[in-house]
Amino acid sequence: MRIYDLIAKKRDGGTHSREELESIVNGYVSGEVADYQMAAWMMAVYLRGMTDEETAELTDVMAHSGVMVDLSPIPGIKVDKHSTGGVGDKTTLVIAPIVAACGVKIAKMSGRGLGHTGGTIDKMESVPGTRTALTQEEFFAQVNRIGLSVIGQSEGIAVADKKMYALRDVTATVSCIPLIASSIMSKKLASGSDAILLDVTTGTGAFMKTVDQSIELAKLMVSIGTHHGRRVAAMITDMDTPLGHNIGNSLEVMESMDVLKGCGPADLTEVCLQLAANMLVLAGKGTPAECRAMAQAVIADGSAFAKCKEMFAAQGGDTRVLDDYSLFEQPAARYELLAEQDGYIVANDAEKIGSASVLLGAGRQKKGDPLDFAAGITLHKKRGDYVHKGESLATFYGAADKFEAAAAEYCSGLVYGAEKPEEAPLVYALVTKDGVERY
């Protein structure tokens, strides 16, 4: 079937066979299908949708467009975790060592930050000397030796997704649930883990803005993973306000270490405990309550922090900075953002805070932009807190000439009120193949 006919079929609401999806995706990767044809087809998908079966097949075709990682040289069940992204979302740096300290192998491939959301690999590289580009042999050997490695995602994984995402980004087809689900799950299937926990963030700092949208996406991704023989669960977590207090690369590493040392912010600690417990459940380690207790125990006895240091040391990192934060690269300047009035913080838009941190140099506005590892923001007041005029809302770190623009961006998402806003839950729901459990 010609690509023209396949575009017309989806435009008219038809359902594609696997062979048709292979023709579209593989044709696009090889160059036989032009950008304008792929853009037309994706817009047809955006407008007409896909069946769950169709989306599962598309995901598998996309996964097989590149390298399929075989983790069988690593014995035992391997559990992966993926977050749909957010501001101050440093959970991987906390939960990977917790789960590994509980005896479950973590062979994780993570990404870099783009736009207002940060990336795990950028955060890891703020620890001086840390290598995130390991060979497959080094990666497998480290996981077999210490039970944990987090590296940058291979360029060869889900090749179709890279091309399709870049095109979606410029053709107004990003916010399409079948295309989002196939994008995320194609990379997860290709990465080779036996079980996958999805952290689907929701709110202003997340891609999905409502809980219902997030649940719809989570159900589809769980269905795709289950269809392909993986154990999958998804947590719906809040991202209306950043997790923890720190946004920025080395700043988020410091805060993650605080959680592993048992002295981190309550919200970040709670979300990490729930994520870690659900990963352990997927690995068959026990009931949710038993697995939560295991996670708490390895924080309390110091073994989770020790495992994190062991990972950084194995990958060349200077682990002294994890104990003494003054050894991190220091910011060029600091700036205190002061409250302009008395009142409760009714809204503290996470996306605006993330964008402000990017303006300071903590993130990228386009691929390839250099990072200032010391740049970022520490929040002193968050949604629901009462502030007095002149009190510090946040400390900005970075080059002094960037503070004015960053402060304007931050304040554009700040709303004061006379009454304390209702507290939002940290976790809204758990989605498994058996259904949705709302909290």
Regions found by a protein language model. Give the residues of each.
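Acidic, glycine/proline-rich low-complexity segments that act as flexible tails and inter-domain linkers
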Residues: 1-88, 309-318, 433-434, 439
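Alpha-helix C-terminal capping segments
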Residues: 47, 93-107, 187-192, 227-228, ...
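Glycine/serine-rich anion-binding loops at beta->alpha junctions
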Residues: 77-100, 104-116
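Short, small-residue-enriched loops and turns at beta-alpha junctions
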Residues: 14, 28, 46-49, 85-87, ...
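Phosphate/diphosphate-binding glycine-rich loops and adjacent basic-rich segments that engage nucleotide
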Residues: 144-193
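Well-ordered secondary-structure scaffolds
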Residues: 5, 17, 28, 68-69, ...
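A glycine-rich helix N-cap at a beta->alpha junction
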Residues: 123-149, 219-225, 229
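General beta-strand structural signal in soluble alpha/beta enzymes
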Residues: 106-110, 132-135, 150-153, 197-200, ...
